[in-house]
Curated annotation (Swiss-Prot):
The modification Phosphoserine is found at residue 657. InterPro entries: Nucleotide-bd_a/b_plait_sf, RBD_domain_sf, RBM26/27, RRM_dom, Znf_CCCH. Residues 1-13, 48-59, 90-105, 356-373, 559-588, 677-688, 846-863 have a biased composition (Polar residues). This is Zinc finger CCCH domain-containing protein 41. It comes from the Eukaryota. The keyword Zinc applies. Residues 20-34, 898-908 have a biased composition (Acidic residues). Residues 587-630 form a coiled coil.
Amino acid sequence: MELSVSSPKQSVLSPPDCMSDPEEEHEISEEEDDDRNHKHRRKEETRSQSLEQDSSDQAFSRPYRKNYRHYENGNSFSEHEKRSFGTGSGQRVQFDNQRMRSNPMFSRDSGPGRGRGNYGSWAQRDSRFNPVDLSSHMVQVGSMGQGMFGGRGLAGVSAAQSAPWPPFGMIPGVPNGGLDGFHHLQGSLRPPLNAPLNMGIPRQRCRDFEERGFCLRGDMCPMEHGMNRIVVDDVQSLSQFNLPVSVPGAPHLAASSKQVPAQFGGASFMNPKGAHGRTNEGGMAVDGLGYGDAYPSAGGTDFYDPDQPLWNNSTGETSGAISTLNSHGVDENVAPLDDSNQDAAENGCGIRDSRSTSQSVWGRMKGSNSQANSKEKADAVLNSSAVPEDQLKEVSVNSSRHGKQNHVGESVAKVVDSSNISNDMMNNTRKPTQKAMRTLFVNYVPHESNRRDLILAHFQKFGKVIDIHIPVNSERAFVQFSKREEAESALRAPDAVMGNRFIKLWWANRDSIPDNGLSTGSGASMKGRSMTASGAQNQFPIAAASKSNHVSSIAKVPTFQTGGAPSSSEQPKPVVVTTSGPKVTPLQQKKADTLERLKETLRKKQEMLEQKRNEYRKKLATLEKQGTVVKREEADEPDAKRVKLDTASDSGAAIASPKTESSTDKKVPILKPLSTAKLSTETPSPDSKNFKQRPYSFTTSLNAPMVNRYKLDNRTTTIKVVPPLPTGLADVAVVKEHFSSYGEVSKVELEDNASIDSGKDHETQNESRAACVTFVKRSAAEKAFANAKCWQEHTLQLVWVTRQSNRESNNNNNNSNSLSVSRDNLSSKNKCASVSNDPKPAVEVKTSSTEEPENTNVSGDNDSTLDKQETKESDNDNNKSNHESIEGASEVIATAGTDEEQSEQIHQ
């Protein structure tokens, strides 16, 4: 509904309490001449919530809002009019000389009346209202709240400085049709900032804001956007504006039930900001809506559908209503390899000339259109190919000169500090190219699900699948359909791909099997990057094929040529479509040769690894076989045979020295770990299977030595000092002190006459005594046996004592022999012979030899060498004890004979 002004003259709008006589107008005009009066300037600041009027004539020649901007020369221009910087396109006001003296940022109230029965009290008008004939009989100004005409903009809902104005019935008696369209904008409006900020600093007008109606740089833009503007913090709130997309500068409010008239337009139609006011809130900032000179008809305008989501969940694309905004043609449906490159492409490819003034914040989001528009899109692409290249360069430089960009999904606006960086990024941006016609790119597929049969089972529901390419060891796949419609249906399917909602679908960059010989790739290479200009997704089949060793990938060399017409989700792009037959460019041929060389190298490496793997397996099997053979031989050897060999051993070898015995004991466990070390120090195989097998072979090879180390040692640790003991050694403390230097002594015993009478001769007592020293460890006993034979220049005779029973039997034999010798001197030699032929040592040898295998069997020892040596040691100990007992018996016999002779001499 168009609202017009009833009369160019002023009407009474002031509240009743502000009414004054017309004579006061001349007095007020005199006060206005003195604009440097401090009192009036203070009055101007305290009335920041009031509205401003330029003049009574201008109040009806333009919309009811502060629509004129001023320069230093005092000229004013209308925001509807396109102008060049430094010129004013508006009318000269009657108080032009006063405006030149006043601050251009804060033009004070002009015209007679200044709140005294005239329009002066409503001089500063809000941007949301239009020229309406507001007469005193229909508007009660005194009843209007401060929230309706508050300051330099309407109070926002989020940070309101006054009560919010209602959507309907704001002005009694005024139709609300013209205000229906923006009653829902209260949530996105912002309160004004303090007016004196940035006072007196004139800035240039933002060209984007003037020509296109909005500025994507938002609060980060250093240019001037006027006193009123709307800053949008998030993308979702843009749906409230319903930005037009097809017609340049066509600002419509789709929520309004009636068409907005042309004179309603203006770059700051709904802007609540104060002069140079800025909010520091990050995010996508739109300084104004795309409102141009006048509103064209909305017949061909595609509006945003609030019932349709901004993004399709299945494809990651925008809805069809928003997708037509994307006119720069940057390829964003495929995940880029370089985010910075993508950012530069998004910023740089936004063409800022008259052809792209309809591009808004939605311009960088790719959408999927209906199938009905696919032919129109294809024709538009072919027609746009005639755009001169130098014009594209000019537009790119113009866009990169600003050096700022904003992302839709981000909460903070990105600022590029240097224009050189932006220019460099623009040089590296990829050129727009067409998409594949029938091939879909499947990404984020789990490795276990990335199989040909599973992918085919899902996509064959939508149509005939003619090719599936799965790169090796990747989460990607390329599925090509026989028809374009089938691929689109699979792309727009609402259900999850293969039952996994994380799997995403995009259009691929090219078709593996070209269609009608059309090439969709430009084939141009970029400097500084080893990728084609067709986009980041071009590298996916190339990089994946370099890892593949399948023969089928050789047939996919035509992947480098793409075919087909532009997809329905593509926007018109200035590209050159080559309709000639498929060509193999030198770059593509070079890549194919490189791919073949890589595959050949990979095949040779795999053959070498397989050969090494087989060799390691053979070695491992041989070593395991050798270990099992040795164990079987040890287990099959009978115990009786070992006893027989031990008993038949030579007595000379049995009386081996303790040094050699100890050395052999120490050498045996050393040899075994050396043999096992050979198994454990093998060169590790690169195969993961061999790494798993190595710990097993290592533990099995060290199994026997580990058990032997903890084997129970039953060898004796008792040493006997054969009598006669030297004088002074027949004391337990002395014996212990002498032998404790070689190791820890657990027990010292003096045999025979341990408790003697003081009346007997000490020398005779020492001759009949023997000392038994028991050590804690066998090693200490061996050391003492080898080195403790000398005590104060006396030589000691040391023997091993195997058992307590053996010592007792020897003592009994010695006592019986001494008694028999005392009775008959002549039969002493026979007694000695009988002692030497005593069968007990032989029995003891057998028992010891049989006991040792039992002990080894209990401990689980399978080492025959250790068993043999232990058996020999026990035999040597027994033989030594036998010889010692024989020698002791002969000495006892000799001493008994001498004692008997002495007693006979005494009797005589």
